[in-house]
């Protein structure tokens, strides 16, 4: 699975830098894996330059290990299917919903084999709709479907005015995550602290506290500490906390560097006193501008798109690509009482390393080596 892990990570970090540059130092949160799967869904029916641009953006030859199109297609599909099967197998340990839907104006007829592949491989919804005559009903129906699929967690993925009656095809991608820590933070130890950020001027944030053994690495270049916070279900959050400027870390984010920084040989199990903010980030992105900037242009251009493998009825292109993501980080774990008892014992031990996340930081959430989410907290 290393090849998909590498391709997804490079896609993730390239996209992160592009999105961060356009956020004005605000919070960033998205799921590279769900976007990777959404674009792989489009790739199933893409041809010529549309296909090659997707392949380049997703590093498909890296993901598949093969150079030609048919082998890379099957290699990519099989690896993604295994990843999602693995994620869903541990679903009882966390709340994770990933939703992909492709909605095209009714004059286009989806190819039967495309619908079957989309549903089988990516559990995606593929549907003909009436943007032209029933725009508001269509918008509400899409929103209701996403809300149902995410158990009410993600609502109004397409806001009023979010699509027009001239829309041809809309790609909707939504993801919700809430995990439970292996070792919960104790609510009584959460305190209000100042978060040192221009975006948080004068704002007090709820800072969780815990002192016990964590995996921690100290990196000299760029200067930072990386803390591993474990969720149930084999999912880990890695918090990249800079000593100085966060941009020094952002500029060096690559799959190879992240693997080196978080290598078990490098991360030492030690007593750490952790101060970590509660935060909730909900983002609704129109992805076209970011993906165009990274070279994926043709699928959004009526005169250039070749998505003839998806449907018949004329030149098909993507009018809108929506990505809505939601994460909530609280004290919650499997057994708060067990964590409390552990805290009492470990606080008697001296020489803890301090990890105080009271200024902007990056985080990556992984299952094994596959990045599920990445984000930046400028103000909790």
From Swiss-Prot:
Subcellular location: Cytoplasm
GTP-binding among keywords: no
CDD domains: serpinB7_megsin
Keywords, ordered alphabetically: Cytoplasm, Palmoplantar keratoderma, Phosphoprotein, Protease inhibitor, Serine protease inhibitor
Tissue: Predominantly expressed in mesangial cells. Expressed in the epidermis of the whole body.
Pfam families: Serpin
InterPro entries associated with the record: Serpin_CS, Serpin_dom, Serpin_fam, Serpin_sf, Serpin_sf_1, Serpin_sf_2
A single MF term (Gene Ontology): serine-type endopeptidase inhibitor activity
Principal cellular location given in the protein's record: cytoplasm
Feature type site, description Reactive bond: 347-348
GO cellular component: cytoplasm; extracellular space
GO biological process: positive regulation of collagen biosynthetic process; positive regulation of glomerular mesangial cell proliferation; positive regulation of platelet-derived growth factor production; positive regulation of transforming growth factor beta1 production
Phosphoserine carried by residues: 217, 223
Disease linkage: Keratoderma, palmoplantar, Nagashima type: An autosomal recessive, non-syndromic, diffuse palmoplantar keratosis characterized by well-demarcated diffuse erythematous hyperkeratosis expanding onto the dorsal surfaces of the palms and feet and the Achilles tendon area. Hyperkeratosis is mild and non-progressive.
Reported function: Might function as an inhibitor of Lys-specific proteases. Might influence the maturation of megakaryocytes via its action as a serpin.
Family: Belongs to the serpin family. Ov-serpin subfamily.
Protein name: Serpin B7
């Amino acid at each position: 699975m290393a090849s998909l892990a590498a391709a997804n990570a490079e896609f993730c970090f390239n996209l992160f830098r592009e999105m961060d540059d356009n956020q004005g130092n605000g919070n960033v949160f998205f799921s590279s894996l769900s976007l990777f799967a959404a674009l792989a869904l489009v790739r199933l029916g893409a041809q010529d330059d549309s296909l090659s641009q997707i392949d380049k953006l997703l590093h498909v030859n890296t993901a598949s290990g093969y150079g030609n199109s048919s082998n890379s297609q099957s290699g990519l599909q099989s690896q993604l299917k295994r990843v999602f099967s693995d994620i869903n197998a541990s679903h009882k340990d966390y709340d994770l919903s990933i939703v992909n839907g492709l909605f095209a104006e009714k004059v286009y007829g989806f190819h039967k084999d495309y619908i079957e592949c989309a549903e089988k491989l990516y559990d995606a919804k593929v549907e003909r709709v009436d943007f032209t005559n029933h725009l508001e009903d269509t918008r509400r129906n899409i929103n209701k479907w996403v809300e149902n699929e995410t158990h009410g967690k993600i609502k109004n993925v397409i806001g009023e005015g979010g699509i027009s009656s001239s829309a041809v095809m809309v790609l909707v991608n939504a993801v919700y995550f809430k995990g439970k820590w292996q070792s919960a933070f104790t609510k009584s130890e959460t305190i209000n602290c100042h978060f040192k950020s221009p975006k948080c001027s004068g704002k007090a944030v709820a800072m969780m506290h815990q002192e016990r053994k964590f995996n921690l690495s100290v990196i000299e270049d760029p200067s930072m500490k990386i803390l591993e916070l474990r969720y149930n279900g084999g999912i880990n959050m890695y918090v990249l906390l800079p000593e100085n400027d966060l941009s020094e870390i952002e500029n060096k984010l690559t799959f190879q560097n992240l693997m080196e920084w978080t290598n078990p040989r490098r991360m030492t199990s030690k007593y750490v006193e952790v101060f970590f903010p509660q935060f909730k980030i909900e983002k609704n992105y129109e992805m076209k501008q970011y993906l165009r900037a990274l070279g994926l242009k043709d699928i959004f251009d009526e005169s250039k798109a070749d998505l003839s493998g998806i449907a018949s009825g004329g030149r098909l292109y993507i009018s809108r690509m929506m990505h809505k993501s939601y994460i909530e980080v609280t004290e919650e774990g499997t057994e708060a009482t067990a964590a409390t008892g552990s805290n009492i014992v470990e606080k008697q031990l001296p020489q803890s390393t301090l990890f105080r996340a009271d200024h902007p930081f990056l985080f990556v959430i992984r299952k094994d080596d596959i990045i599920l989410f990445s984000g930046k907290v400028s103000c909790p």
